[in-house]
Design a protein with these regions (language model features):
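Short, structured segments at the rim of ligand-binding sites
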Residues: 1-225
Length: 225
């Protein structure tokens, strides 16, 4: 939220983030990019303070792919003066969804879902009505829950095209998958679970947030993974 708050109010103060079971969550990408947009960044007693009278667009090349870094700076840049170009950005569907949402409010964002996002700053944003797409990680979790219990599940109002990396691994595990434009059915009844090797990677690779669920599935498989 740091980028959107400093862009709108000129000042933001938030606690330094912690982490999760995977590890700590560094925020260097976020802070370095905000400084390039003109924000003054200070670390005080476990808090990050960012301030700026007016952010100014620039070109930013992320040193590594970061979903939250891309989203944070995209939200900051929509209210910055002039054009901002973000390179080496995350291409996750959620980044595209955020761009669509911001554009529905009056932002001018193009290129979301590619390696480069271009943002033309606007003076302000307006309210809008927006339907949030289904969560592919949540859907994948339900699919694996059915797989480990040798069940049958149908998930509706989902976009299977966003989940090819997950569905391909489920097929390799022995699940039968039937997918249409907005529905996925998994059948694992009376089947043996096969081991599947997993390597996580930025989209369109296999999502990190699905590795724990697949660990459970692989733990019940016949073989090594």
């Amino acid at each position: 939220v740091l980028g959107s708050l400093v862009a709108r109010y000129g000042f933001a103060r938030i606690a330094l983030p912690g982490g999760c079971a995977i590890g700590t969550r560094p925020v260097d990408f976020h802070l370095d990019a905000l400084e390039k947009l003109g924000a003054k960044i200070e670390l005080k007693n476990g808090y990050i303070e960012a301030s700026s009278k007016k952010l100014v667009g620039c070109e930013i090349n992320f040193p590594g792919i970061s979903v939250t870094g891309t989203e944070n700076i995209m939200m900051a840049a929509v209210l910055a003066k002039g054009q901002t170009v973000l390179r080496n950005v995350a291409k996750e569907p959620e980044v595209e969804d955020l761009a669509d949402f911001l554009n529905s409010m009056g932002a001018k964002i193009s290129g979301a879902g590619t390696d480069e996002i271009i943002i033309e700053g606007v003076e302000d944003l307006q309210s809008s009505v927006f339907s949030i797409p289904a969560d592919r990680i949540e859907a994948g979790t339900y699919l694996i829950a059915a797989a480990v219990t040798f069940g049958d599940i149908t998930i509706s109002d989902i976009q299977p095209s966003r989940m090819n990396n997950i569905l391909d691994k489920l097929k390799l595990s022995g699940a039968s998958i039937n997918a249409s434009d907005n529905e996925i059915q998994l059948i694992m009844d009376k089947k043996s679970i096969l081991p599947v090797d997993i390597s996580t990677a930025p989209f369109p690779g296999f999502p990190t947030d699905m590795q724990a669920q697949f660990t459970v599935l692989n733990a019940l498989s016949n073989g090594s993974s």
